[in-house]
Amino acid sequence: PLDNSTDTVNINKNDVAPMTDGTDLSSDLQNGDVTINTNGTYYIGSVDVTNIVTVKTGVKADLTVENVTMTSATSSPIIIESGAVVNLHINGTNTVTATKIGKAGINVAANSIESDYSILTVDGDGILNVTGTAQASGIGANLKQLHGKIIINGGTINAVGGMKGTAIGGGIRTSGNVSGCTIEINGGIINASAGRYGTAIGGVERQSNAEIIVNGGYIKATAGDSVTYSIGPGRMTPTTEQFGVNNIYINGGSVDGTFRSTDYDKVQDKDGNKLKQVVLTMPDAVEMANKEVTVGSWKTVTDSEAKLYVYVTEGTTGYAVTYAGKIYRTDDIENQTTLTEYSGSDCTCTDANSSIKLSVPDEITVNKIVGQTKIKLTTDFEKSSDCTYPTHILNCTY
């Protein structure tokens, strides 16, 4: 028996079997390809394989990957067929690589008809390194294929696309109209790099109804050679540009990327207000680099130089973020882009000014097997005229 006051037990995490939730497919995947054709919760951990995982049409699967390496020379290592819904949870470090031309690392498929598409949602605290080949995406479409809905809520995603493809989004030689072909980023750290003639995040060629929505997180989007913009449509040839994104909505987050000049009118917030980028710098470039900060209701991280790439409406003058319990702000984003610590008085708004009662929640999300429908209500909130506190939390009840 142990004497709790004197004895110590050291446990190495590598000596402890991982806790699994749901059906463990690790052994099956080591022995061959795996097909998920039943709704359920699944786990794959600590494997290094050349086999593939396919989630069949109509299946809803919660899949956790933990310290997984998947490489395929014949296919996408992970295939999500059109009409399938996958919640992908990432733990540890995971690497997914396609080496066959025209194949995505993680294939999120859609057909060329209305509302026939797959949905991939990624979250977790781990790392996902995913690479596609030429003419395809890292996460998204194969060659001659539309991409489905891609939602990223968390994790560190390092996505690399092939030549004429995208890191996250479409492949080339596509044609069709799928309303759910959206890319939505709500959180996480996303490093997206495209191959030559490709954009990092977006649709390619003739895919229509594609939208990019950013509500939070940090995005570093790097275009391929011969392309001057990293977010939006790609290029089929060195001389031909093809439209692939209808709208780009930025409601939060830090987005380090560029847009084609004709696409800047498409960059807007959820209310349709046109946006412009402002690059802000935290006051300590060493201590505050690669750190999480809060802006209103969403979170992001600074880059390696402690910079934030935020989007604001025309006429915006001030901006404030919270880091380590302190507020950093500027009152003049045009001329003072380095944030300084706020040292003024606390918030003086009364409860009557800072609270509002709603008859229903401010957002209702209806989940369906082939998509989501969101109904949003907005409420104007004005702080007390004499209050100088830079950030305000609106308490909503219903």
Regions found by a protein language model. Give the residues of each.
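Surface-exposed loop/turn motifs in large extracellular/passenger domains
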Residues: 52-62, 79-98, 105-132, 139-161, ...
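Thrombospondin type-1
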Residues: 347-357, 363-398
